[in-house]
Amino acid sequence: GTEADVLYYFWVKQAQCPECANYVDLFSTRIFAKHAYPKRHPTARALCPGCGEVNETRYDEKQLRCTSCDLEFDPQTGPANGQKACCPSCEHVFPIAKTIRERGKPPNHRLYAKLMLLADGKKAYARTTEADRAKFEEAVRLLADRDSPYPVVAIEPGYNTNQALGYNYRYWHEMFNERQLLSLSILADRIRQISDPVLRDLFTCLFSGALEFNNLFTSYKGEGTGAVRHMFAHHILKPERVPLEANVWGTQKSSGSFMTMFEGRIRRALDYADNPFELRR
């Protein structure tokens, strides 16, 4: 197969049905990717509820036939509807937040799609494969082998944290998946090794920005704008039902990555310090 950089992985939260114990994907719509200005750029991507294939469609399409399994479905709907969800297996309707809270631990997530940057510079959406899942499991193992890779700090109750606590997020590191924790811990280690204290502080500030865009509370804004909606976009820590996993280090076409923030924040700030435009004559 062709090798490509993955810009973003797409995940969905799951709740366990209280009636039949099957895990329910908390999609409110099967359309998971569309342009930031869909009326001008109507092409979107929808996930087949039958086989999991990624289908190209319009953002407002209401009847779609899967190109892989021929299943007809309405891409505008999903198991989740407001604060409740309907189990596709047994049709039991249950409250989402209460069901997750009673489980006593943060909800499960399922990896279902990815956006790749191909060698020719084009982007392509695709369903995830066993190889993708194996790579994630490898990250889980590598994280387990690291010595104290992240701080364990409790989340205190408050206006901005109560929603997260309601979903059983008790510690800050639980807001990240294992691959994010692995990547961020490696990056933090390298920053700590910088001998110049000024440069070390500079990159520590940049690392703080990377945390905002690389966690399970981010979501996909779509193409045509900065693709990653960071964790503080809602001014509270809102658990995202369809979180986005970005490429922590990044590529030239990434959003919210360490590399692109270096170019967009640090390099621009240094250029401005050398040549502040208000003082030009």
Regions inferred by a protein language model and the residue ranges of each:
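Nucleic-acid modification enzymes, centered on SAM-dependent nucleic-acid methyltransferases
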Residues: 1-281
